[in-house]
Each structure stands twice: as C-alpha cells, then as structure tokens.
Amino acid sequence: MYSGSKHGVRYLLKQNGTLPEGIAAPTCQTCHMQEGNHEVRTAWGFLAVRLPMPDDEQWAKDRATILQALGVLDPQGNPTGRLDVVKAADLARLTQEAWQKERDKMERTCNQCHSLNFARAELEKGDDIIREADRLMAEAVRMVAGLYQDGVLPKPESYAYAFPDLLTFHDAPTTIENKLFVMFLEHRMRTFQGTFHANPDYALWYGWSEMVRDLTEIKELAAELREKHN
C-alpha cells in the first residue's frame, strides 16, 4: 500500500537517486510517528468506526449496522459490554473532540509539505470513501443478519445474539460469515487505507472492487442457503 502510494514512489525515487536528496518524500514514520514514539493513532482508528454518529441519515444507519456486527451495539442498537472494552483500551475515537484532535494533528503533519486546503481535501476523500464502503458493508451484514432472523442459520452457542459477529474473525461458523469477515477486515480496510495513503490503484482494485465482489457472492450464498432451508 505505501510503496505504490504517491509518498512511497517519491521515497523510492529519492532512494535510487532519481529525485534529489533534499526533496520531500515522507515515510510511515513521518506521518504516523510524529512525536518519535510508536503510538500510531489516527482520527478514524484501525477499523474506521467512531462516535458520534454522522448527520447523514443513511450513513448513520449503516454505521450502526456495522457496530452491531462488531458487537458494540446489540441487535436493538443498545450499547454492550464490548463498548466498555473499546473505551477502556481507547481503541476508537468516541467523541467529536477526540476525533477532531487526531484530525488536526494529521493536518499539521500534512501541512509540513502541503497547503492546509489541499490536506483537508485529501483527508475528506478518505472520509467520503468510508461512507461509501460502509454502504456496501452494511448491506452485506443485513443480508447475513436476515438469515439468522428467519431461522435459516441457527444461532451458535458462542454468540450472544442471533446476529453475525465480525469479531469471530476467521473462526466464523459459516462460509458466508467468513466471506463477511474478509470483506470487513481486509477489503474495506484496503479501500479506506488506500485512499488515505493516496494510492487509488490499491484502494480501487484491492479494496473497493473486492468489496463489490464480496457483496455479490454473499447475496448468492444467502439465496442458496434460503433455497436449501425451504
């Protein structure tokens, strides 16, 4: 992701002497370890979920669905014990102030080489792609949740609710939920991380396009499971 990004390409060209020594070519450390430590923290965090909910009504619904699949909210939308774990470990930004603090920090870092207007516009592209990726992701989650709701999939004993649980990771009990996990933790992540790192090729072909394919396959698997159930 980094080596094919605009920053990564500049660094490699600088390294092989194509670009002069004094030219800007940010590395991972430049943007993510600004204070010289390993606290690699961003506004959106590792999973690109946060609170409060957005003003965009559709996006708010989609994010709520994803938070339900992460077990942070129950199927009725109420907070669970997992939210307390997230709070205790500070895994995500849970207030607008906390999110804005990290965004401001990143803007200051970008401003070392870019204008603030350019930096903000690029970061907003990342925000926008998260919204679009969440649209696909939430549709897939609801597809699998419907299988549980209609009794097509039996609730596993290890599940707190009859609802897909993304935190089972690769130990998900069904093929369709394994597909859902990969869609979330691999392809959705590539989509937004590739965008934030100015690597559109990575974001599109290894992220977004894979998410679209995942959703198509999940729809087909869901239809097959329903047909067998009936």
What is the predicted role of each segment?
Residues 1-229:
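Primarily the internal scaffold of c-type cytochrome electron-transfer domains
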